[in-house]
Curated annotation (Swiss-Prot):
Domains as described in the record: Has three domains with a flexible linker between the domains II and III and assumes an 'L' shape. Domain III is highly mobile and contacts RuvB.
Keyword Cytoplasm attached: yes
The protein's name: Holliday junction branch migration complex subunit RuvA
Gene3D superfamilies hit by this protein: 5' to 3' exonuclease, C-terminal subdomain, DNA helicase RuvA subunit, C-terminal domain, Nucleic acid-binding proteins
Subcellular location: Cytoplasm
Region (Domain II): 64-142
Name of the encoding gene: ruvA
Single GO biological process annotation from the record: DNA recombination
Function: The RuvA-RuvB-RuvC complex processes Holliday junction (HJ) DNA during genetic recombination and DNA repair, while the RuvA-RuvB complex plays an important role in the rescue of blocked DNA replication forks via replication fork reversal (RFR). RuvA specifically binds to HJ cruciform DNA, conferring on it an open structure. The RuvB hexamer acts as an ATP-dependent pump, pulling dsDNA into and through the RuvAB complex. HJ branch migration allows RuvC to scan DNA until it finds its consensus sequence, where it cleaves and resolves the cruciform DNA.
SMART domains linked: HhH1
Family: Belongs to the RuvA family.
Region (Domain III): 147-197
One example GO MF annotation: ATP binding
Length: 197
C-alpha cells in the first residue's frame, strides 16, 4: 500500500491527475482535479489510497491526510464506494458534511450525488459521533490547499529545525504559498524577510 506520492504533476483531466514519479505516470482519481491547475509541472505531494479489484488497480488522491481519513470513513459506509466518496468530498464543505452527519440531517445528506435516503441514514448510523472537534479525524479546512508544495514544505521543516516556532511559521505559510515555483532556499529567504517585518 502507498501512503503518499511525491512527483511532478504532468496532466489534469476532468476526473484524474497524472503524477510522474521516476518516469512512471500514476493516474490518480481526485475530488477536484482542476484545483491542482496552479501546480501543473511542479513537484507535489499527494496522499493516496489504493483499491485493488479483480479488473482494476485504482489510486485515489487527497490534498492531505485529513481528506484521506474522511474518504476512508465514507467508504466504510455500506452503499458508498470510492467514486461516490470522492463525489461527496468534491461537493461538500467538509464541516457542513460532518455537522449533517452528527445532527442526523438526512435532507442535507441526500443532496450529494449517489446518496439516497437509505444511504444517508446509514451514514448517520455508521459515522455519527466518530469525528473529533476539528472535524473528520482532524480535518482542517485551512490545510485543504490544492496540494502540497514540496519546496515550501522543505523550507518550513528547515526553519523549524533552526528553532522557529510552528505558530510563527503558520502565520506566514499562506503568503509563502502564493509565491509558487521557488526553491527551498528562496522560500527560506522569503520567510525570514516576512518574519522580520
Amino acid at each position: 500500500m502507498f501512503e503518499y506520492l511525491n512527483g511532478k504533476l504532468v496532466k489534469i483531466s476532468p476526473t484524474n491527475i497524472v503524477i510522474d514519479l521516476s518516469g512512471i505516470g500514476y493516474l490518480i482519481s481526485v475530488a477536484n482535479p482542476y484545483a491542482w491547475s496552479a501546480l501543473m509541472n511542479t513537484e507535489v505531494k499527494i496522499y493516496v489510497h489504493q483499491v485493488i479489484r479483480e479488473d482494476a488497480h485504482s489510486l485515489y488522491g487527497f490534498v492531505n491526510e485529513s481528506e484521506k481519513a474522511l474518504f476512508l470513513r465514507l467508504i466504510s459506509v455500506s452503499g458508498i464506494g470510492p467514486k461516490s466518496a470522492l463525489a461527496i468530498i468534491a461537493a461538500a464543505d467538509n464541516e457542513g458534511l460532518i455537522n449533517a452527519i452528527d445532527n442526523s440531517d438526512i435532507k442535507y445528506l441526500t443532496k450529494f450525488p449517489g446518496v439516497g435516503k437509505k444511504t444517508a441514514m446509514q451514514m448517520v448510523l455508521d459515522l455519527a459521533g466518530k469525528f473529533d472537534a476539528t472535524g473528520a479525524v482532524g480535518i482542517s479546512l485551512l490545510d485543504a490547499a490544492p496540494a502540497s508544495n514540496l519546496a515550501l514544505e522543505e523550507a518550513i521543516e528547515a526553519l523549524q529545525a533552526l528553532g522557529y516556532k510552528a505558530t510563527e511559521l503558520k502565520k506566514i505559510e499562506k503568503k509563502l504559498a502564493q509565491e509558487a515555483g521557488l526553491t527551498s532556499e528562496e522560500y527560506i529567504k522569503s520567510a525570514l524577510k516576512l518574519m522580520m517585518k
